[in-house]
Amino acid sequence: MLSRISLPEGFSISLYSNPVPGARSLALGVRGTLFVGTRSRTVYALSDTDGDNYAETVHIIADNLNTPNGVAFRDGDLYVAEVNRILRYDEIESHLASPPAPVVIIDTLPNDAHHGWKFIRFGPDGKLYVPVGAPCNVCRRNDERYAAILRVNPDGSNLEVFAHGVRNTVGFDWHPESDVLWFTDNGRDNISSDPQINDNSPPDELNRAREAGLHFGFPYCHGADVQDPQFGLERNCNEFTPPQWELPAHVAALGMRFYTGSMFSASWKNVIFIAEHGSWNRSTPIGYRVTAVRLDESEKAASYDVFAQGWLGSDGTAWGRPVDVLVAPDGALLVSDDRKGAVYRISR
């Protein structure tokens, strides 16, 4: 299957581990353990104990959780996001074969299943960033936690809204030099009764949040200026922070990372890699690939290109769906795939 993946000249792709059913969000431990969340009930830990760039050992950290998509690592501890809870597994890399009982950090997040799976990461400020998706295709809730990115102290205190108007982000990262947050967002579905319009509108988004308190438009506006047919007349699109890049509609942009490794050439420094999970309701499928966004000197998005593709066949059938990306300690790019139940390693 991997022979079908096309990459820029000089790059190659290989399997990184034994099967990881439903592999989604990725987090790296200080000892090199790769933690993998899923949308089922299980969290995995992958270990490459002999240094051959293949994780031959797969541990199960938990197998009774509620959609533990999000994983994050800090100070020796693993944080796991369920739909309405954040858990912490202390000193996890010392107990991979026999994980400790988790500590509940917070258990008051909304419990809606729709867009309820969460991607989590610690920011440069030491806070844990936790998105709460809109509990619908398009709607408005009085609770400001919905369609937002929240942040909270590691102990669960001082939960606050960082960004508003974010329909469903499943991936974000901070610029390595400026510490500015960038994130993907998935556009709404069925915006029109015209199938051709639905196929190409509204866009998915790559956004930049220079400060707290910004509003990115949902549910009133999508992309830079696409008014929502239900809510759009209530607000003007110029009131909101527009995306840095409008991604093709329905590519399902999920995980993203700035490239900070040394394996790739210098031209790849600080490039954003995006895992596009792929469309589910477009007449001609799109996505199912990893793309690359380059920034200019002012840290604005300047170009968007395909980096790795081939999970989608010419007949419109996809055998794999990229979910998250992560830069390994040696500079390789790891890619999770929840359809194939795999983690790949892209190297040069």
Give the role of each language-model region.
Residues 15-20, 59-65, 105-112, 161-165, ...:
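Surface loop/turn motifs at the tips and blade-to-blade linkers of beta-strand repeat domains
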Residues 31, 38-39, 83-85, 91, ...:
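Short loop/turn segments immediately following the C-termini of beta-strands
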Residues 57-58, 67, 72-74, 84-123, ...:
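Asp-box/WD-like beta-propeller blade repeats and closely related beta-sheet repeat scaffolds
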Residues 22, 30, 57, 64-67, ...:
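Beta-rich catalytic cores
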Residues 33-37, 77-80, 127-131, 180-184, ...:
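Conserved beta-propeller blade signature
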Residues 26, 71, 120, 169-172, ...:
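Hydrophobic core register within WD40 beta-propeller blades
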Residues 19, 29, 74, 121-125, ...:
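Structural WD40 beta-propeller signal
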Residues 1-9, 117, 134-137, 147, ...:
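Beta-propeller domain segments
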